[in-house]
From Swiss-Prot:
Topology versus the membrane: Peripheral membrane protein
Classification via InterPro entries: GlcNAc_MurG, Glyco_trans_28_C, GlycoTrans_28_N
Binding site for UDP-N-acetyl-alpha-D-glucosamine: 195, 287
EC numbers on record: 2.4.1.227
Name of the protein in its database record: UDP-N-acetylglucosamine--N-acetylmuramyl-(pentapeptide) pyrophosphoryl-undecaprenol N-acetylglucosamine transferase
Species of provenance: Streptococcus pneumoniae serotype 4 (strain ATCC BAA-334 / TIGR4)
Family: Belongs to the glycosyltransferase 28 family. MurG subfamily.
Function: Cell wall formation. Catalyzes the transfer of a GlcNAc subunit on undecaprenyl-pyrophosphoryl-MurNAc-pentapeptide (lipid intermediate I) to form undecaprenyl-pyrophosphoryl-MurNAc-(pentapeptide)GlcNAc (lipid intermediate II).
Record field: catalytic activity: Mur2Ac(oyl-L-Ala-gamma-D-Glu-L-Lys-D-Ala-D-Ala)-di-trans,octa-cis-undecaprenyl diphosphate + UDP-N-acetyl-alpha-D-glucosamine = beta-D-GlcNAc-(1->4)-Mur2Ac(oyl-L-Ala-gamma-D-Glu-L-Lys-D-Ala-D-Ala)-di-trans,octa-cis-undecaprenyl diphosphate + UDP + H(+)
Regions that span the bilayer: none
Amino acid sequence: MKKIVFTGGGTVGHVTLNLLLMPKFIEDGWEVHYIGDKCGIEHQEILKSGLDVTFHSIATGKLRRYFSWQNMLDVFKVGWGIVQSLFIMLRLRPQTLFSKGGFVSVPPVIAARVSGVPVFIHESDLSMGLANKIAYKFATKMYSTFEQASSLAKVEHVGAVTKVSDKNTPEPDELVDIQTHFNPKLPTVLFVGGSAGARVFNQLVTDHKKELTERYNIINLTGDSSLNELRQNLFRVDYVTDLYQPLMELADIVVTRGGANTIFELLAIAKLHVIVPLGREASRGDQIENAAYFVKKGYAEDLQESDLTLDSLEEKLSHLLSHKEDYQAKMKASKELKSLADFYQLLKKDLS
């Protein structure tokens, strides 16, 4: 039986594509393994998925771009992670390794290359993350969402592979209940912040609940179960699975962070959106670059977190609603998307 090893983690964005691809390989008779951190979000997501995947936990160290005494300890963690990954590779002898990035992916990528296993990696952002900059040196091939420099000879630009379904699925009963609390005459605004980026949206909704619910139906994906609430013109929930796409479709506008996975999902369904990227104090600035790219293309409006107020947000919402047809036309004309089926076929072809 053919074997494939996946790696990637630290944030949901470094796991999502793997979660989409793994069922495809399982259906085609592959034995699927995953290398990550048992305390990381990658392990949580795989457990929740229920997929028939063997998880291998390794030591991980964070890759920092700045000086920290913690770097010295993490060098040893990464080194031990490489040794652990090498033993896994030599024991499994897989046909390939697929990496979605994140600091946990560096040891498996290096170990795969050392053991002669082909390495395929994926980069979602406009600028390459530090983990993928290292991984690229060991990779057989890199797939990218955005165009990369021509000097990177091993990169193939494939566009965004989104998890948005093309099928019309039945409305969940819970969605019907939510809609009975909404005013059909008001626009619906969905706030979605990812695994760590929702706090600023949560605070905005909490501070301006009255004003917001007078003018909009508000959906707030909080990541915090203590905020769960369903009342007139307001639905706050910590986490959704089957409801995720129906809520996206229900919304007239989405207010989101600038992670590539989410904004390309919005592009795929031509959904109006305001991007509030994580700042450089909380990230390497990739979300700022992603947001600027989408604004330049005419797909979205952006708003820096430091400028986020009720008034500034409402100005952006009003502008998008007033120019809805223009934004949607540009999104629908985009050629920057790739279906999961097409990407899977491309990957299988490259593996053969």
